[in-house]
Amino acid sequence: MRTLFLNPPSFQGFDGGASSRWPASREIESYWYPVWLCYPAGMLPDSKVVDAPPHKISIEQTVEMARDFELLVLFTSTPGFEVDCRIAEMMKATNSKLKVCFVGPPVTVEPEKTLNASSAIDFIIRREFDYQIVDYANG
């Protein structure tokens, strides 16, 4: 499956703390790249990693990417969770065949709440997700 690994766009003016998911956009030009998304992407030919906040990729630009992929792996965070759900819904509306997987701390802490948050979320993976995503994408 052609897979998009997404650190989604942030909402305007949000300034958060450093982690492997940097959901903030700010004046600092030094960001951690999304390490945990890069590991499985390296095992899936023809996949793509998009780190939207530091590259100022808009929600609209991100949604358009849905047309080119079969699987979306979205690394969510607690501060951005609601916005991330809306982005997933918009991407699924653009490509109804897109499978959407959420990963990240909120998924691990509250898996049922995550699954029930949006009909766009097809499945979640708690904790470490790198090999599970690769297995899923490879069928």
Roles of regions detected by a PLM:
Residues 36, 40-139:
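Glycine-rich beta-alpha loop elements in corrinoid/cobalamin-binding modules
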Residues 1-31:
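Short glycine-rich His-centered loop
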